Amino acid sequence: PLTILATGGKSYPGTGSDGSGYALAAAVGHTIIPPRPSLVPIICENTDKQFTTLMGLSLRNVTLNLIQKKTGKVIYSELGEMLFTHFGISGPLALTASSYMDVPTDYRITIDCKPGLTPEQLDARMLRDFEGSPNRAFGNALEALLPHSLIPVVVAKSGIPAERRVNPLTRE
């Protein structure tokens, strides 16, 4: 017969959850499955200084994708809410995604801020917005689409100067 021995984890020694139950189980011959963090915020290794400007930004109705670096396989993808913190990301999406991670450095995360739109629909929406205000600067033209604190990061990642007028911009 199989035996499940529930002795708590080892995440909070102050409460008695110090991992001693694993040693007890191993001593009597049980196979131990190494524990790993689950339902925890995700610490992001990111050298991009702009990332820290997002601290405190809460996003709703976004899709978080957890992608295995080696294979490019999407391990987790869900629509919901998340929060940028001083160390990475938190909130319901991040907490759930963390339970899918074996070795944290083996993954990358993407966030789709407009999951209800296909890439083609997003292109069309942006071009339509740009045509409506052709003399607006690129950075300002994104205000209808993104939270204010996210705009400088998106502008920097796009390679398009924030002050460039949107009238000559195309899908390319």
Model regions: which residues?
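Short hydrophobic core segments
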Residues: P1-S17, A25-A26, M82-F87
